[in-house]
Amino acid sequence: MKPHLLQNEELKELIAKIPGWEIISNHLEREFNFGDFIEAFSFMTKIALICEKYNHHPNWENVYSKVIIKLSTHDLGGITNLDQKIASEINEIFEK
């Protein structure tokens, strides 16, 4: 998938398609909370496999049972269709 920057209208529609995510500055961000560190780390491991598949990696933080994920395409300077796809897949993993 070749990434392209999402424009204002696309960004507005994006939030409805990926519940829980926010647009902050030039990236997508979402916080996920789990019961403990093992659950949080397991979630991160599943996400890592998706990110490797697309060769597109998030900025993220993990503090015990909390994971904060930030997605943007640095080369293009903002949020792209690839960030949207990965955010959607992350939501699917979280909902399982």
UniProtKB/Swiss-Prot annotation:
Q: Does the keyword Cell division apply?
A: no
Q: Which reaction does it catalyse?
A: (4aS,6R)-4a-hydroxy-L-erythro-5,6,7,8-tetrahydrobiopterin = (6R)-L-erythro-6,7-dihydrobiopterin + H2O
Give the molecular function GO annotations: 4-alpha-hydroxytetrahydrobiopterin dehydratase activity
- EC annotation from Swiss-Prot or TrEMBL: 4.2.1.96
Q: What InterPro entries does this protein's entry cite?
A: PCD_sf, Pterin_deHydtase
One of the GO BP terms on file: tetrahydrobiopterin biosynthetic process
Q: Which family does it belong to?
A: Belongs to the pterin-4-alpha-carbinolamine dehydratase family.
Q: Please name the HAMAP family in this protein's record.
A: Pterin_4_alpha
From what organism does this protein derive?
Answer: Prochlorococcus marinus (strain MIT 9515)
Q: Which PANTHER family match?
A: PTERIN-4-ALPHA-CARBINOLAMINE DEHYDRATASE (PTHR12599:SF0)
Q: Which UniProt keywords apply?
A: Lyase
Mind telling me which SUPFAM superfamilies this protein's record contains? PCD-like
The name this protein carries in UniProt is: Putative pterin-4-alpha-carbinolamine dehydratase
